[in-house]
Design a protein with these regions (language model features):
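Active-site- or binding-pocket-proximal scaffold segments within functional domains
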Residues: 3-151
Length: 151
């Protein structure tokens, strides 16, 4: 999603990777469905969410920005291995082809890594959020109104 190769190899292509613009949808849906990737078997591999430290950095860069871009850089290193697997026929998109175990494991790990990062962002935001006094006040008013109309 964050490289120019998100939907087929773009630009110079000395290794002859696919330029098929359906690779994105295949990875996000077709491969997972064909390989039978499901949530339940992955759950034991899901670690607890962690809070991203928002402590000021010596370099004065925003800690959340750094955490997100570090994650993206790590994921970018996975782009070429994916295209190598496609070139080797391991993604199972051809009629009658199977999804190889290597490709299944690769996609499962990308899902787990993405979930780990999303959970860290969510937990960090939730823990750092101020109390929602507006909604609490609305709930108190609604409960008070309901109490007045009760028999």
């Amino acid at each position: 999603h964050t490289t120019k190769h998100y939907n087929g190899w773009a630009g110079e292509n000395p290794r002859g990777y696919t330029t098929w613009n359906g690779i994105h949808s295949w990875i996000d849906g077709g491969l997972a469905a064909k390989a039978g990737i499901r949530l339940e078997p992955l759950l034991p591999r899901v670690p607890p969410a962690i809070v991203i430290s928002l402590a000021p950095r010596e370099d004065r860069r925003d800690p959340m920005f750094v955490a997100v871009f570090d994650y993206l850089r790590r994921q970018h290193t996975m782009v070429e291995p994916l295209y190598v697997m496609e070139k080797e026929g391991k993604l199972g998109q051809a009629a009658g082809a199977r999804v190889h175990d290597e490709a299944r494991a690769f996609v499962e790990q990308r899902m787990l890594d993405g979930g780990r990062m999303l959970s860290a962002i969510w937990l960090t935001a939730w823990r750092g959020a101020v109390p929602d006094t507006y909604l609490r006040a609305a709930l108190v008013r609604r409960q008070a109104g309901a109490a007045k109309t009760a028999p």
